[in-house]
């Protein structure tokens, strides 16, 4: 049984989504309305959920993208998908850069939403086609590997760490698996981010895949 959390400021939307998703007997869905409080993150155990569907426009002072970033700061292994009534393409790049696993429109069919969720649960990232084309275009304009600066090439250890990141493991879990300290993993991830010119684990995996590193 996979636990899903829907965060939205409209009770009808939350309950409707819960009803739709729970037609799948393998999904258990909870709903939560956000509060404009600094204690909101600490009051809830987001780590107990396998995936979070996050609305963007939560009303008042609460912004779904910022709330997602705060949750990921406290729970870096959380898998979050933007769940919005707006055009997905307008927010996809920001979501990926923030470390989220993609974006889904609320207007999608029940089957497609469920399919997207299972993709993410299986460790995959939902990549909008327009954004993927943009990524590939950027990669074509980069220097060939032979002309890259030596310090910009990922080390074998960094590649190994990135492979563990792709599997969805936390820094501590990666440290335990590789018999390294958590601090060492954090330093390595900072180096990876700088070399790939990215700001999140999700984006690092995407770029590494497009470069053939993973």
UniProtKB/Swiss-Prot annotation:
Chain ranges of the HTH luxR-type domain: 147-212
Xref: InterPro entries: CheY-like_superfamily, Sig_transdc_resp-reg_C-effctor, Sig_transdc_resp-reg_receiver, Tscrpt_reg_LuxR_C, WalR-like, WH-like_DNA-bd_sf
Modified residues (4-aspartylphosphate): 55
Post-translational modification: Phosphorylated by ComP.
Domain of life (superkingdom): Bacteria
Location (main, coarse): cytoplasm
Domain Response regulatory: 3-121
GO cellular component, one term: cytoplasm
Tagged with keyword Flavoprotein: no
BP-aspect Gene Ontology terms: establishment of competence for transformation; phosphorelay signal transduction system; regulation of DNA-templated transcription
Cellular compartment(s): Cytoplasm
Protein name according to UniProt: Transcriptional regulatory protein ComA
Primary gene name: comA
